[in-house]
């Protein structure tokens, strides 16, 4: 009867909040829109891969929503960052646009934040297993994640349709990111594939309800 999680992420997308502070953060002084990567549910092993790449790419802005937001983790992220960054809890609207990285140190916003990205990185793939890929894919963007994804059918399916990409280390991450940043067609095609995958998978809830009704 299908997977009701697809219906759920579509519902979440419909209810996603407008987040003025994110819009402000994404404003660029030069009027050139940055390429935004949203790193959702990240762990230290993930951050060690995407933060150095972010440092080398001034055309990028980065939103990090760490899986754990305790003090030590936030401090370790800040210690790695060499570009202007700010925690959401300490952000001021008047200088948000000057920051290159926004650290989301509160829960409950991630599913609404993905809408502002062009690329998503989903954490957990270097630990026990990746977190929710569908929350990002529903917005039609390519989804990158570490090697531990095999327990998750939707991640395997995303890879199969060309909307998801598993990276195994710093080098494979760089190769895929270089492609997405330099080839607008690759970025658009993979994002479209991810979004279509979710759209084409919805309907399970209706199906289940119909079956219950028939019985």
Report each predicted region and the residues it spans.
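Nucleotide-activated sugar donor-binding and catalytic core shared by glycosyltransferases
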Residues: 1-215
